[in-house]
Amino acid sequence: MTRKKTNPFVAHHLLAKIEKVNMKEEKETIVTWSRASSILPTMVGHTIAIHNGKEHIPIYITNPMVGRKLGEFVPTRHFTSYENARKDTKSRR
């Protein structure tokens, strides 16, 4: 049996903001917390500030990003290697 293809998820408030900006035809940054929303072709050319848990990171949407999720482009974790922490303790001695 084949499965039915579902529509991409986009938060309704984000979609309303995008439509409003498209009608104005002005470039402005759209702020969102919805990392699970898919990128639609109507979003191409806009700058969307996506929340990473601490702050909003502005991302410019281009054609290759269509179909992917907003959260894929903003990392939520900051990597600190063990070696860097170890070198700092030696310099303090």
From Swiss-Prot:
Question: Where is it chiefly localized?
Answer: plastid
Tell me the superkingdom of the source.
Eukaryota
Q: Where in the cell is it found?
A: Plastid, Chloroplast
Q: Which InterPro entries match?
A: Ribosomal_uS19 (IPR002222), Ribosomal_uS19_bac-type (IPR005732), Ribosomal_uS19_CS (IPR020934), Ribosomal_uS19_SF (IPR023575)
Q: Name one Pfam family in it.
A: Ribosomal_S19
Q: Does the keyword Endoplasmic reticulum apply?
A: no
Q: Which GO terms describe its biological process?
A: ribosomal small subunit assembly; translation
Q: One MF term from GO for this chain? A: rRNA binding
One Gene Ontology cellular component term attached to this UniProt record is: mitochondrial small ribosomal subunit
Family, per the entry? Belongs to the universal ribosomal protein uS19 family.
Entry-linked NCBIfam families: rpsS_bact (TIGR01050)
Q: What does this protein do?
A: Protein S19 forms a complex with S13 that binds strongly to the 16S ribosomal RNA.
Q: What name has this protein been given in UniProt?
A: Small ribosomal subunit protein uS19c
From which source organism is this entry?
A: Triticum aestivum
Q: Which gene encodes it?
A: rps19-A
